[in-house]
Amino acid sequence: IVIRPGVIIGGGDIFMKRLLPIFKTSFFIPLFGDGSTKFQPVFIDDVSLAVEKIITDNIEGQGIYELAGSRAISYKDFYNYISKCLNKTRVLVPTPLNLIKPIISIAEKTPFSPLTSEQLLLFEKDNIIQNIDKSFKDLEISPQDTLQITKNIIEN
């Protein structure tokens, strides 16, 4: 059995831990690419519940469990939602990926890099479940609402 989660949020995750300080302190927010790339963030508690269920229910066999959140959302829409939750006006600055790649490849060699080259790849194409082998549904789990979880993270 293979468990393949989407971008994990919650529980002090790296994604939100790096993103929120930028939104809290910067007026201009870099938007890698044009922001139309979609992703499907998943709450850590939902992933933990799925792993627990696979183990405790003694699920055997083969298969890939693609665990993704309740909705696919573009980075642009997600960033705008974060701004709204923070009650802050932010200007999203589209940044061509081919321009940012060399900068990130140098920056990631320092302790101050906001992200890695590998993480930058997530902005190149949609990161949503498509060819589902197995998912939360097969485990009788309904993933929590991604935007509500994001709002809770921001408020706490």
Label the predicted regions.
Residues V2, F32, D133-F136:
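Short glycine/proline- and acidic residue-enriched helix-loop micro-motifs
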Residues V2, K38-P41, A72, I129, ...:
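Short aromatic/basic micro-patch
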Residues D13-M16, D34-T56, G63:
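Substrate-positioning beta->alpha
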Residues R18-Q40, I44, K84, T89-N127:
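Alpha-helical membrane-targeting segments
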Residues K53-L115, N131-N156:
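Mid/C-terminal beta-alpha module of Rossmann-like enzyme folds, strongest
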